[in-house]
């Protein structure tokens, strides 16, 4: 446990993500994103959201095989409260459990894009302005 925590804070995040999910990194490492998604930022935050997915919420995924590997699709989550954690959990499932790991874009309220320091993070982690 201690060695993995040390590695979490000392290893290059993108190298760690590439080792754990090479198909996802290969798919998006050279693709410019019109919405501002940053693979480096995603890699930096992936362990936190993976912890929420696997250990905190203990998400159980069913039906992921029905989501197309290439074609567009719409996934609808329903959340209450301010934070769109359903979108983040769907993203974790799609990057970690789908046969063709895909980036998920989830809609967030404009308000997040007006907050100093948070606006860039929101874009870089794959979120899109809802209006």
Residues covered by each model-derived region:
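Membrane-anchoring hydrophobic helices of lipid-metabolizing enzymes
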Residues: 1-130
């Amino acid at each position: 446990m201690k060695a993995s925590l040390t590695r979490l804070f000392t290893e290059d995040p993108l190298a760690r993500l590439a080792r754990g999910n090479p198909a996802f990194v290969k798919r998006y490492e050279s693709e410019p994103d019109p919405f501002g998604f940053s693979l480096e930022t995603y890699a930096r935050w992936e362990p936190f959201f993976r912890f929420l997915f696997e250990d905190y919420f203990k998400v159980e995924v069913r039906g992921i095989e029905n989501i197309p590997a290439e074609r567009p699709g719409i996934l609808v989550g329903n959340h209450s409260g301010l934070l769109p954690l359903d979108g983040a959990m769907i993203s974790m499932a799609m990057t970690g459990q789908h046969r063709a790991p895909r980036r998920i874009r989830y809609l967030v309220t404009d308000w997040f894009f007006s907050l100093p320091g948070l606006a860039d993070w929101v874009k870089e982690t794959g979120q899109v302005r809802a209006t």
